[in-house]
Structure formats: C-alpha cells, structure tokens
Amino acid sequence: MEAIKGSEVNVPDAVFAWLLDGRGGVKPLEDDDVIDSQHPCWLHLNYTHPDSARWLASTPLLPNNVRDALAGESSRPRVSRMGEGTLITLRCINGSTDERPDQLVAMRLYMDERLIVSTRQRKVLALDDVVSDLQEGAGPTDCGGWLVDVCDALTDHASEFIEQLHDKIIDLEDNLLDQQIPPRGFLALLRKQLIVMRRYMAPQRDVYARLASERLPWMSDDHRRRMQDIADRLGRGLDEIDACIARTGIMADEIALVMQESLTRRTYTMSLMAMVFLPSTFLTGLFGVNLGGIPGGGWRFGFSLFCILLVVLIAGVTLWLHRSKWL
C-alpha cells in the first residue's frame, strides 16, 4: 500500500492525531510526516465536530460505505472487512453501577495497516489506558497491537463493571437473609444494567472471536492469540452476567415473598385484635342503645362492675386464642 502524507489526515478539530513511532510511543502528526505500515497514524475524531464531519465525508482515504458508518447512529458491536481495511464497532463501559444503564459508549473505527480512524461522540474512558501507555512509550508498535490493546482495555472495564454488579448482588442477598428489603427500583435498575450489558457484550465477544480467526494482514499470530484470550475472558464475564440475571430473578421472588409475609403478619395481627375486642364492642354497643334505660344505671357500682366484666371477657377471649394456638 502507498504511504500517506500527514497533510492528508490533518483535521483541525480532531481529538488527537498521532503517529506511532514503532517503539511503543507516539508523536503529534505533522503535515510532512510519512504514514506507512511501520509508522501508522491514529486519528481520533468526534464526529459531531464540523471539521471532523467534513473530513469524514470528503477524504479519499476511506471507502464510501465507511463514511456513514463512522459518523452514524450507535449500533451493536460488529466487524466488517472492506477491501484492505476493516470496519469495527465496539462498546465501552463509562460510569458507575449507580447510574442508569445508558453508559455504554459506542466507538467506531476503520483501520488498515497504515491508518487507524476512530470516532466517538461521548468520551471513551477505556482509551485513556491505551493513551497513557503510548505517552509513556510502553504502548503498541503497530495497528494489530493497537487493536489488541484497545480490546483488552474495553474488556478490563467491562469485567470491572460486572464485578461491581456481582458485589452488589451479594450484598443484596445478605440483606435479604436479614429480612432487609432494598429501596424500590434498586433491583430493577440492577437487572436492567445486567440485561443491557448482556445485549452488547455478547456480540462484542463474537467480534473479538472473529478478529482472532480472520487472517487480517496487519495482525500477527501473537495478536490473534491475544485476541482469542480476550474473547474467552469476555465470555466468562457473560457467563457471570447470566448467573447474576438468574439470581436477580430469585431475589425478586424472595422479596415478593418477604413482603407478602409481612402483609400477612399485619393482617393476622389486626384480625386477632378484632377478635379480642369484638365481644366488648358488642356489649358496649348493646348497652349504649339505651332503650328503656341502661341496666344498672341507678346503681353506683354498675359502671365499675361493667368494666370488670369487660376486662374478664377480653381476658377470656385472649386465653381462648392462646390455647387455640392463634397467639
């Protein structure tokens, strides 16, 4: 493939444009730099910026069917070979487990052995790890190594997020053993996050597996082996997600059971109180009718005797309930 001049990928509002030096480091791209397989270029763009959008729409370095994909709407992870290059869409975890499950950020990239063009709208936090390694001179030396390092960083962030969700589920299970109900919506958010992760990480694992099996010219056997290891690691994370989803279903049933038992207990208590006080309520209502005068109304000890009778009646009903093992 012919070399590319640095001026051809000069985008004023690019997030950054770097030239890999072949020794694990980078340097800012200059107009007179020569871009080839030994010194590939990484151009990172925000496709909502006007200059970046114009460059994506007009540059002859990209196939026509790649332009819309790099600046289009978010889609599920996928990989497509297009001539000498490859179009890849990946998802990255941004944010924490306390956020709503919309923190999966899309990153699209087109690459061949000379040029890496990556686009995003929101910042991809996982790229910070790769950028840091490159700035310290310990990063990838070629396009294949760059792709492996990026996929490894994405998987690290996904695995860490899955582990955080798993820890939350363990804490929730421990609380349920102590009859502690989580706040309303907590379990639903947790389950939604797991489902969203499952939705995007499953095809992303397939992307990694395909990259490991494809004979891409800019990926060595070592790159393919490392990519397969990344796919296997993400597959284990997906197994963990499936187990967590099943556990949240069990916890939802357990929470419903605990709440039903609590409601039954309260209803039972109110029923017992009604049974205890129903006879006394009947007598007080009967005497309160006051037709033809209240019996014993003219006797000075009548009210006291009536109160004693009520106490005896309540005690008798309580004793009966206790012997019947209702109390």
Curated annotation (Swiss-Prot):
It is a multi-pass membrane protein. GO terms for cellular component: plasma membrane. It comes from the Bacteria. SUPFAM superfamilies: CorA soluble domain-like (SSF143865), Magnesium transport protein CorA, transmembrane region (SSF144083). InterPro entries: CorA_cytoplasmic_dom (IPR045861), CorA_TM1_TM2 (IPR045863), MgTranspt_CorA/ZnTranspt_ZntB (IPR002523), Zn_transp_ZntB (IPR023714). It is found in: Cell inner membrane. It catalyses: Zn(2+)(out) + H(+)(out) = Zn(2+)(in) + H(+)(in). Keywords: Cell inner membrane, Cell membrane, Ion transport, Membrane, Transmembrane, Transmembrane helix, Transport, Zinc. Residues 1-273, 322-327 are cytoplasmic. Gene3D superfamilies: CorA soluble domain-like (3.30.460.20), Magnesium transport protein CorA, transmembrane region (1.20.58.340). Residues 295-300 are periplasmic. GO terms for molecular function: cobalt ion binding; cobalt ion transmembrane transporter activity; magnesium ion binding; magnesium ion transmembrane transporter activity; zinc ion transmembrane transporter activity. The chain crosses the membrane at residues 274-294, 301-321. Coiled coil: none annotated. HAMAP family: ZntB. Belongs to the CorA metal ion transporter (MIT) (TC 1.A.35) family. Zinc transporter. Acts as a Zn(2+):proton symporter, which likely mediates zinc ion uptake. This is Zinc transport protein ZntB. It comes from Salmonella arizonae (strain ATCC BAA-731 / CDC346-86 / RSK2980). The lineage of its organism: Bacteria, Pseudomonadati, Pseudomonadota, Gammaproteobacteria, Enterobacterales. The gene is zntB.
